[in-house]
Curated annotation (Swiss-Prot):
It catalyses: GTP + H2O = GDP + phosphate + H(+). It comes from Mus musculus (Mouse). It comes from the Eukaryota. Its EC number is 3.6.5.2. NCBIfam families: small_GTP. This is Ras-related and estrogen-regulated growth inhibitor. Pfam families: Ras (PF00071). It is an enzyme of class 3 (hydrolase). One of its GO terms (molecular function) is GTP binding. Belongs to the small GTPase superfamily. Ras family. The keyword Nucleotide-binding applies. Binds GDP/GTP and possesses intrinsic GTPase activity. Has higher affinity for GDP than for GTP. GO terms for biological process: negative regulation of cell growth; negative regulation of cell population proliferation; response to hormone.
Length: 199
């Protein structure tokens, strides 16, 4: 059997937006009511995505980490889930600054991410419209999902699967670019040698 592809995913957002609940819903298909928001956890999960076995390492960040810790998590990850709570406008407004930090940390690479509006079951308390989420996702050039870790509404599994697909696509593009670049260097070296020989 072929070795499984390994993907490192990290989930970011303000404390209380439901990051842990989203991860637990994805892994267990259940909702757990109580979490310690100061805990950071890493989970391993294997899944078959598009006929390929993928081993995910998922970092559930605490949401209250200091700058050095957060930047270390950003350097570690290959794909990112940025989460806000649709009932908390402040959490939505923190997404763009978070993306800017990600861009700075991952420079010059483009960041692979997905935007998630959580707590869609609390529509009666909504402070961020679906359209605003879609608009921000367009600005960030990423996919957007609204879901509820509590009820399972929306497709949380698809969030993680789509992020894995994006990471794999990005790797393939970077691999081709690297191969093209090294082929060009070899051709240039051969041309230099041939020029010296003929002169």
């Amino acid at each position: 059997m072929a070795k499984s592809a390994e993907v490192k995913l990290a989930i970011f957002g303000r404390a209380g937006v439901g990051k842990s609940a989203i991860v637990v819903r994805f892994l267990t298909k259940r909702f757990i009511w109580e979490y310690d928001p100061t805990l950071e956890s890493t989970y391993r999960h294997q899944a078959t995505i598009d006929d390929e076995v993928v081993s995910m390492e998922i970092l559930d960040t605490a949401g209250q980490e200091d700058t050095i810790q957060r930047e270390g998590h950003m350097r570690w990850g290959e794909g990112f889930v940025l989460v806000y709570d649709i009932t908390d406008r402040g959490s939505f407004e923190e997404v763009l600054p978070l993306k800017n930090i990600l861009d700075e940390v991952k420079k010059p690479k483009n960041v692979t991410l997905i935007l998630v509006g959580n707590k869609a079951d609390l529509d009666h308390s909504r402070q961020v419209s679906t359209e605003e989420g879609e608009k921000l996702a367009t600005e960030l050039a990423c996919a957007f999902y609204e879901c509820s870790a509590c009820t399972g509404e929306g497709n949380i599994t698809e969030v993680f699967y789509e992020l894995c697909r994006e990471v794999r696509r990005r790797r393939m593009v970077q691999g081709k670019t690297r191969r093209r670049s090294s082929t060009t260097h070899v051709k240039q070296a051969i041309n230099k040698m041939l020029t010296k020989i003929s002169s």
